[in-house]
Every structure is written in C-alpha cells, then in structure tokens.
C-alpha cells in the first residue's frame, strides 16, 4: 500500500476518529450501568416536582449560555464555526445543549450523532442529539470498553459520518445512583394524592343509650352534617358522644416526608436545597446575586459545563490548539456595565490593554475576527 502510494503520488487522507472505544465508567452490573435502563425512568422521575425543578435549573441555565471558540495558548476569541451556533438542524443551540445536560444528569452520558463532516479534515460540521433510550452498546469481553453502538437496533460506525460523539458526565446518572430516593419521593407523593382523593372519616357519633332505628340514625347524621356547615360548635345529648378518628396530613407526616425528600433530591442533583424551597434549608446568610450565581456555577453547573467543553475541545471535533468554552463571563456572570467600564478604564490607564482591545471587550469593535462565521 505504501509502495503504491509512492508510485502514484497519492496521499492518504487523515481519518479523525470520534473518541474510539469509550470506556465504561463506574461500577459495571447488568442492572446499574450507564448503558442499561434504570429502575426508575426519566419521565417517571420528572413527576417529582423537586427533581423537575433541579433539572430545569441545571439544563435551562447552561442551555442559555453561548459557546465560543478560543485559541488555547492566548485565550483569543476566534470565529465560531456554524455548528457552535446551531449544532443540529432540528432545533436551536439552547435546546440541544439543554437536553445534553439532561442526558448527563439522568444517565451519566449523552450522545450526538455526526450527520455532516468537513471535506477538508473529516471533522464533524453538524450533529443530531440522540436520546439515551435509543442507544445500546456492545462491550468487549471484559466489559471495560465499548466495541460498537447501535441506534434503534442499527449498528453505527465508530468514527466519521454517522458515528456517535459521547459526552461522559463527571458523576453517575441519578437514575442509577438515586433510584431509591426517587422511588421514595414518588411513593410519598402517591400516598398523599390517594389520601386527598379518598378522605377518611374524621369521626363518628357514639350512642350510649338505646339503639335508634335506621331512619333516625340517618336523620341525626344529616342534621349533624348540616349544622357543621353552618357553625363549628355542636350540642350533644347525654346519650351521644363524638369520637375523633381522622388523621390530618400533618399527623400522617406527608408534609415532613415531602420536604425531607425534596432536600435529598436536591443533594442528589448537587443543587442547593433552598433552590427547591425545602423548609429545613431556608436559613442562609445574606449573599448578593453575583456571589450566589458564582456559588451555583462552581458547585452545580461547572461539572456539566466542563464535561461538554472538554468533549467539544477534543481533537476529533476541534483543531488542536483551539478550545470550545461557554461564554460565562459575558452572560451568566455579566456584571453591571458601569462596573465593567470602570475596570476597563483602569486597564487602559495602566496600559494593560489598548483602546481597540477595550472596544473588543465590550463588543464595540467593527474589526477583528469576532462575529465572523466560518463555513
């Protein structure tokens, strides 16, 4: 093959492989591994309001932050390829990123299928988000590495057009690690709904005298019901006693159980419990909006952000020397414009930056590569 290419002068095109043979992370078992269905499904889990709130906070927040291309050595912002602005033809970038975070949260991994590639180097130019329920994997004999993937039962290539780009979470999916917690939250919620739909009798009238005929009993109960609708006090004869047997939701401890499980769900999703309005976590010190956002970014959002940034910056997608980053500072952590201008002015006075660079920092520059789109 090498002799033939030297004689004909043909050069072999470099084949950029898409993370060939991804490793199976976490403990392997046929029931609790990232490539198998969990005991609690995603749709069922989202029936827990606290979990839906955590999911929306994580996926919704990250999905709204734009992606930018930077030069790794200098941090210079480069022109973004089209797929950074819209990875999939089928939905906006924010939706694709939000459901990528959704997959990482619930399953511990996410999938994009390569639907277009650049002719020059074979790197992907368009993707399609693939639901985890559609993907199955064939492992090697040691159950350590993936040999092949299949979408809807059809095996796909491991590189190039039609292959899967795999995003691996820094944590296991909550459908595997939090099965018992999610199931408990669902059970308590179901029990409270059943109790509300089929209320128990709150008490009964006990006759200590002679037995009454059924017609008089019904008349007595009707009179009691009518009186209770008009006033809260009642009068009973010496032969009648009222016995209370009902339990309020507080006595049944539904409220306490729901609040406690809301806290556990928040811990499971690595979200501060006060974001889901858990009563036992309402006491907190004062923090301004910026500091609260920084804490939420560092503790909750960053693991998902890093997983996506690092995967999109790998050599099979982005040219070596460049990195893909979320534009966090100018969006999620954007400061007061007056404060930003004051800082820029100080940097100009100290001759740390030029006026042109300052204009670029505030998106006022008409020149440069910022904003250019490359096919």
Predicted region positions:
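Structured, contiguous alpha/beta core segments that scaffold functional sites
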Residues: 1-254, 258-260, 264-267, 275, ...
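Charge-rich, acidic-biased intrinsically disordered regions
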Residues: 74-80, 122, 315-338, 364-365
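Divalent metal-cofactor coordination and adjacent catalytic microenvironments
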Residues: 101-104, 109, 295-325, 329-332, ...
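Short acidic alpha-helical/loop segments enriched in Asp/Glu that coordinate divalent cations
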Residues: 264, 272-285, 310-319
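Small-residue-rich helix-loop
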Residues: 290-292
């Amino acid at each position: 093959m090498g002799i033939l290419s030297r004689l004909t002068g043909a050069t072999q095109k470099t084949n950029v492989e898409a993370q060939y043979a991804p490793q199976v992370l976490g403990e392997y078992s046929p029931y609790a591994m990232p490539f198998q269905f969990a005991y609690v499904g995603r749709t069922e889990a989202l029936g827990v309001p606290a979990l839906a709130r955590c999911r929306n906070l994580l996926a919704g927040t990250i999905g709204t932050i734009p992606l930018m291309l930077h030069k790794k050595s200098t941090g210079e912002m480069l022109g973004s390829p089209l797929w950074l602005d819209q990875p999939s033809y089928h939905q906006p970038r924010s939706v694709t990123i939000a459901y990528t975070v959704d997959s990482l949260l619930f399953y511990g991994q996410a999938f994009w299928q390569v639907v277009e590639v650049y002719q020059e180097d074979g790197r992907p130019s368009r993707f399609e988000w693939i639901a985890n329920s559609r993907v199955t994997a064939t492992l090697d004999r040691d159950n350590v590495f993936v040999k092949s993937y299949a979408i809807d039962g059809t095996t796909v290539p491991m590189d190039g057009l039609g292959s899967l780009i795999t995003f691996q979470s820094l944590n296991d999916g909550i459908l595997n690690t939090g099965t018992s917690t999610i199931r408990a939250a669902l059970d308590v919620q179901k029990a409270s709904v059943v109790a509300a739909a089929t209320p128990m009798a709150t008490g009964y009238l006990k006759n200590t005298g002679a037995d009454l005929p059924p017609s008089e009993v019904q008349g007595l109960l009707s009179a009691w019901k009518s009186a209770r609708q008009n006033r809260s006090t009642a009068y009973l004869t010496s032969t009648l006693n009222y016995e209370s047997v009902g339990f309020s939701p507080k006595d049944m401890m539904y409220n306490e159980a729901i609040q406690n499980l809301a806290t556990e769900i928040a811990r499971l999703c690595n979200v501060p419990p006060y974001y889901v309005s858990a009563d036992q976590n309402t006491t907190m010190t004062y923090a301004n909006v910026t500091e609260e956002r920084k804490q939420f970014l560092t503790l909750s959002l960053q693991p998902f952000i890093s997983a996506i940034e690092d995967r999109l910056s790998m050599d099979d997608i982005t040219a070596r020397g460049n990195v893909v980053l979320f534009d966090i500072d100018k969006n999620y952590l954007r400061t007061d414009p007056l404060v930003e201008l004051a800082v820029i002015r100080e940097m100009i006075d100290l001759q740390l930056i030029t006026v042109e660079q300052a204009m670029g920092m505030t998106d006022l520059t008409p020149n440069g590569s910022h904003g250019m789109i490359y096919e």
